[in-house]
Regions:
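Helix-start/capping segments and mature chain N-termini
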Residues: 2-5, 10, 14-194
Length: 194
């Protein structure tokens, strides 16, 4: 396959500017070509009484990401896989299902315990780049997120569990391992994507 980019050379063009423009136009190829070094994932709760919580939404999100990154994906294959995985459980589980670039599925499970203790969180030091395509998909490519452990050292080892992220517009976005949910007047709200 061949993909061409070009630009209009005018009297005040510089080679550096033209090269930068060509790289910018070709960025779409680079964003999707990263599909070799990571997997997609969804983490969900399974309980004996209710099965997988919000299963349809998890499947739809994985399907959308698989389409974006051109990963082979079958809703039916995932549903069968999750059903077989659930057959091993007798107690609530935290289930992470991973899809690699070959369409292969793998699970990681652990017993689920209701979090009764409070999490200690703090605001991240630096903003995330809301244009980073990996913020819009759940992937194993986690280097886009700051590490709570690194920031914990900055805060004197206070035992920080997670970081509240914000973007370059100073808008709160999410935590590194969870969603931000705010209750106002009895209604629950989450920020839009990144």
């Amino acid at each position: 396959a061949e993909y061409g980019v070009g630009g209009g050379i005018v009297w005040d063009s510089t080679s550096a500017d033209e090269y930068s423009e060509a790289l910018l136009k070709a960025r779409v190829l680079m964003e999707r070509s990263h599909s070799t070094g990571f997997s997609l994932f969804e983490t969900m709760l399974w309980t004996p009484n209710d099965g997988y919580f919000l299963l349809e939404k998890h499947i739809a999100r994985m399907a959308d990401s698989a389409e974006y990154f051109d990963f082979p994906f079958s809703t039916n294959k995932l549903e069968v896989f999750l059903s077989q995985t659930a057959g091993r459980f007798t107690s609530p589980q935290r289930v992470t299902v991973l899809l690699n670039r070959f369409g292969e599925l793998k699970d990681e499970t652990k017993d689920f315990y209701s979090q009764e203790n409070r999490f200690k969180v703090c605001l991240a030091i630096h903003p995330i780049d809301s244009r980073n395509v990996f913020l819009f998909h759940k992937t194993t490519r986690r280097e886009i997120y700051p590490s709570p452990r690194d920031q914990d050292a900055i805060h004197g080892g206070e035992g920080i569990d997670d970081l509240l992220l914000f973007n370059e517009r100073s808008e709160l976005t999410e935590f590194t391992i969870g969603n931000l949910v705010v209750e106002m007047d009895g209604e629950f709200y989450t920020p839009p994507l990144a």
